Amino acid sequence: MARLKRNRHWVALLCISLLVLFIGHAVAQQDQRGQTSYLKVDITEPFASIMARMSAAKPAIQKRQTDLLNERYDLADRPAQGATMSRGKPLQEGVRVKLPAGTTWDRLAALTPAQIRDQNLYPKGFFPLPHPNHPEGGMIFPHFAIDEIKKQEGRDLTRFDLDFDLPDHFLPEFPAALFLTTRPDLGDVSQGKLVTINNYYELFNGILNPKQLEGLRLLVTPFPQQQFNQTEDRRTATPSRGVACFDCHQNGNTNGAAHLVGDIRPQQFRHRIETTPLRGVNIQRLFGSQRALKTVEDFTEFEQRAAYFDGDPVIATKKGVNVLERGSQVHFMAEVQEILDFPPAPKLDLFGKLDPARATPAELRGQEIFFGKGQCASCHTPPFYTDNLMHNLETQRFFTPVMINDMMAVSDGPIKTFPLRGIKDTPPYMHDGRLLTLEDTVEFFNLILGGKLTAQEKQDLVAFMRAL
């Protein structure tokens, strides 16, 4: 009898254990999948209540992101001597990613990916960077961009729930220079102004043809977007006219505005995406960091129909999706994008390499590293320093998946090889802006690719990339 009771006891324990394992597996599966792919359309909470609730939560959300940035990076304003962007803004210099206590970059580079993972030594600044409020996401703009658009158009891109997170000195210069492949003789055609719906005509009438002028008008015209629209499901204090392409891609470059990619579910697996420049799209054959769209026309249409609304056509219908006409509007917009040129690089020859008569010894040494020991040219091939392919760096070799401010840090997957021409004008770096300086970028790829570069070689490599 006692033996029977003991057997029943063990059977009960076994059943409970199996149930716990089943529930845990089910929860894990749910965390990986999400409950639904769709966003909530029928908002029943009054807008005043939404705004009050999210505004009250804003300080704590901002503090959490600020604390994370300070934990990951040295955010001091330390401009490089003699190194500027096209219109004179100083580049930030130095490695800003903080190392784990007790190690050095050389010691870290000597370890295998498995050793770095098992000893938890992967630098926090190399992990994917979360959105300032990852569960909410959405477009978020630097304050200088908000101020200028509000000044010119009276249109306010301020979000009541969130502010931009990265300091201004790590962002591209504003307004950016604007160069045209069709009129290289004119140099910067922006006249030092931010191109908007209020001034595009006076700036470009007589320089662009009528088709291009209409394309530019569409690029600076705001259309409804997920956070910026006229419904109660918005993140602006008053109904918004929306967002224009050039609100993020200012003057055809970038202002560093951030968003979440719309092609991933659930929310915690979505990647932060930093706005990429439109310069040089004429030589590119892939568009979108991971989507591999094949033409500028495809991407232009995709932005309006999908990216503006987190990849959800249901909610896009509610908020006022702008369906572009492919045969005219899309082509007009694409033609303008395809004549946006890279900035001048006076030290490069016709093949995209350094002219020895113009380059410094450090730049020439850096070029040798770029094409040799550093393995950079395996993907970034001249003259524009892209192979127009996608590559998976398999960064997950170096760390165990972890939740960071409600973002699940896992593998990045295959990412487009972005051109390096004019790279000094477009910080921060990587698709999510996790690397603040070129020095950070060199340390990242030295570790990921196992280059084992010396300190001097790293400095020379930075000097070369500044000349591109």
Where are these regions (language model features)?
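Periplasmic c-type cytochrome electron-transfer domains
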Residues: 26-468
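Short linear interaction motif-like sites in intrinsically disordered regions of transcription factors
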Residues: 9-11, 106
